[in-house]
Amino acid sequence: LDQSIKTFSLSTAYDLSTASLIHTLSAPSNSSTSQQSIEFNTNGTKVFIEDGDEIDEYNVATAFDLSSTLTYVDSLDFSFADHITSMAFSDDGTVLFLLTQQSNDGDDTNDANIYEYNLTTGFDLSTATYVEKFNVENEESRPEGIAFNSDGDQVFITGTDGKNSSNDEVN
């Protein structure tokens, strides 16, 4: 499998018809073969790459430029869960949400869930502490994507099990 992250330049902002590939980052040597999600901090000096059962944190030498030097910082081990498919941070990086798919092994500890972590320091995985999990199996047993509205009071989940996309109020 070609596990890589591709960077495209858009000569007109938000216009994909102007896209051109400018860089391909091969999967870091310490990674598995299942990167599905990538997030940057707000100023682009950190990148977070989902790597199967963990989230890896890297410093980026030049903001939002994956062709610059990436330095491994830390990871959040998630091996107790089945498979991370997506992640989202709060705007200030003090809350991290991880979306997981259920396994097919009959072990109900690996249901489709959103895991919430608080980060004492924004966008710093070494300060992460578990808060809670929210089960979404009844709405979507094979979730793939997670997003929040700008107020953070609605979460949107997409998936592939044939159920409709759902959005739930966040209390």
Language-model features: locations:
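A short loop-to-beta-strand structural motif that recurs across blades of beta-propeller domains
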Residues: 4-7, 54-57, 112-116, 169-171
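Residue-level detector of Asp-centered blade-edge/turn motifs that repeat once per structural unit
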Residues: 40-43, 91-92, 148-151
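Short loop/turn segments immediately following beta-strands, especially the blade-tip
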Residues: 8-17, 57-67, 117-126
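Residue-level marker for isolated small/hydroxyl-bearing positions within beta-strands
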Residues: 50, 99-101, 158
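Short glycine/acidic-enriched loop and turn motifs that connect beta-strands
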Residues: 2-4, 54-55, 102-108, 161-166
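A short beta-strand motif characteristic of beta-propeller blades
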Residues: 20-29, 71-78, 129-137
